A protein has these predicted regions:
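Alpha-helical nucleic-acid-binding subdomain
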Residues: 1-11, 21-22
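Helicase P-loop NTPase motor core
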Residues: 124-127, 132-203
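Glycine-/small-residue-rich beta-strand-loop submotif within the FAD-binding core of flavoenzymes
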Residues: 121
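Proline-centered turn/helix-capping motifs that create local helix->coil transitions or kinks
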Residues: 1-6, 38, 93, 148-160
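Short glycine/proline-rich turn/loop motifs
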Residues: 7-10, 28-30, 126-127
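Conserved helicase NTPase motor core
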Residues: 14-118, 130-137
């Protein structure tokens, strides 16, 4: 996004350098959007940032309108989203974000985990409230998750715990493919049906 905001020529370069079919499809898609007066999600983020950057009066209007900002799933925000939030909240401190750096799974879609990891540096004076009690899982499951998360090289340190019982020991299923995994789970469910009804099982 940084590069696209600074140089609109990049969009044309992207079109020219793609294989012909993809280039043509994307060009038609962009034309259709323009004809319909529509924007997709990425367009909304890009154009909002350009609007706020190039028209300070518009930015100020929205800063006055959105005096308090709450962002959920902050670990999954991308650079453009981070910049919109920063522009809206800069200098005011009326920002609350909720997120878990251990649950960032959308980097393939452009999510930038640094948005949450560096939040304290980006917003000095902020308060961090760690919600470390897990209401859903047994302690054995939580311990296993903690042991894996602890190996993350960049993280916000936390010690998650459960107030539930220790629970059954975990069993690891190693599969060569998603099909093999699905078959193994289905076979286990089929086997367990003798001990309990399907209604008492969860996958």
């Amino acid at each position: 996004y940084k590069a696209y905001e600074q140089n609109k020529q990049l969009i044309e370069d992207d079109l020219r350098n793609k294989i012909p079919l993809v280039r043509d499809i994307y060009a038609r898609y962009q034309n259709r959007c323009q004809q319909a007066g529509a924007m997709d999600f990425d367009d909304l983020l890009l154009q909002t940032n350009l609007l706020f950057r190039d028209h300070p009066d518009v930015l100020e209007k929205y800063r006055d309108y959105f005096q308090y900002v709450l962002v959920d799933e902050y670990q999954d925000t991308n650079f453009a989203q981070h910049l919109i939030v920063k522009r809206l909240c800069e200098g005011r401190g009326n920002l609350c974000v909720v997120g878990d750096d251990a649950q960032s799974i959308y980097s393939f879609r452009g999510a930038n985990i640094d948005n949450i990891l560096q939040f304290k540096q980006l917003y000095p004076g902020c308060q961090i409230f760690k919600l470390e009690r897990n209401y859903r899982s047994t302690q054995n499951i939580v311990n296993a998750a903690n042991s894996l998360i602890r190996k993350n090289t960049a993280q916000i340190p936390k010690q998650v715990y459960s107030e539930k019982e220790e629970g059954s020991k975990l069993q690891v299923l190693s599969s060569y493919s998603d099909y093999e995994e699905a078959y193994a789970v289905a076979a286990r469910v089929h086997e367990m049906r003798r001990q309990m009804p399907y209604a008492d099982m969860a996958v």
